[in-house]
A protein has these predicted regions:
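HhH-family (HhH-GPD) DNA N-glycosylase catalytic core used in base-excision repair
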Residues: 1-258
Length: 258
């Protein structure tokens, strides 16, 4: 929850935690944590805020990129806000399939209010158990499409997505992509936001399809977004974030290669 420049987050790290974060005018983050285990809570918060990794190599490598260069100059401090659990990233992926981002956020929030434990004004992030006990029809009543509801319940019961932290990104992404009802975009969401991996891009994202359509001068297909992200290699996930934010703030112009 963001209010008056302060980001409030609830999550688990040796018990329920509450963190309040604001950025000072000269850049550093000021953090206040309420937790039974402050050190664990701070370490987990660093992951969620994506300040546990230095993305300077990405900024340097693509400073002159025809699509990303201007975005990097204006948004160089941008980092994706990660989820505290992989299960939360999976929920985002399921809710966000083939719908606009705002509608997906509203649906996600509704499901969290329905199923996740409260911690103060906020909800703790979902775990594997959060939706495993629901019947798909209950999630359908809350607004989730039947196919998506079946996918979320099935995976919550049958797959411990938190264990994906222990495997390489390619293995984790392929494991998600193999699941019925998911695909490349869902794999990118889980890898980028749940695992904190930058190698897997958001191929098939509706915003990137729209961007590709503008660049190509025709209706783009999901395969075009994969081609768009391919040059960014191990940074394809972070490039996805910069391209999507950049497209919202200022349209990107076609280049000679697109």
């Amino acid at each position: 929850m963001l209010r008056d420049g302060v980001l409030s987050l609830a999550y688990e790290a040796g018990g329920p935690c509450l963190a309040r974060v604001r950025q000072l005018p000269d850049g550093p983050l000021e953090v206040r944590i309420e937790s039974p285990r402050p050190r664990e809570a701070l370490e987990r918060l660093r992951f969620v805020l994506a300040v546990d990794e230095d993305h300077t190599p990405f900024l340097r490598e693509f400073a002159g990129d025809p699509l990303l260069g201007e975005r990097i100059r204006t948004l160089r401090g941008l980092r994706p806000l990660r989820t505290a659990t992989v299960a939360h990233a999976l929920l985002k992926a399921v809710c966000g399939q083939l719908i606009q981002a705002r509608a997906a956020r509203l649906l996600e929030a509704k499901l969290l209010r329905m199923a996740a434990p409260a911690h103060g004004e906020l909800r703790l992030p979902p775990t594997r158990a959060t939706f495993a006990g629901f019947a798909p029809v209950e999630l359908v009543r809350a607004g989730l499409a039947a196919r998506k509801a079946a996918t979320l319940v099935r995976l919550s019961r049958n797959l411990d997505v938190e264990r994906l932290h222990a495997v390489p990104t390619a293995v984790a992404g392929d494991r998600i992509e193999r699941e019925r009802g998911l695909g490349p975009w869902s794999a990118g969401m889980v890898c980028l936001f749940g695992l904190g991996r930058y190698e897997r891009g958001l191929a098939g994202d509706l915003g990137l399809i729209k961007l590709c359509s503008s660049l190509l001068g025709r209706r783009a297909e999901p395969e075009d977004t994969a081609e768009l992200l391919a040059p960014y290699g191990e940074w394809a996930g972070l490039a996805s974030v910069y391209l999507l934010v950049g497209a919202k703030t200022k349209p990107l112009r076609p280049t000679a290669s697109w």
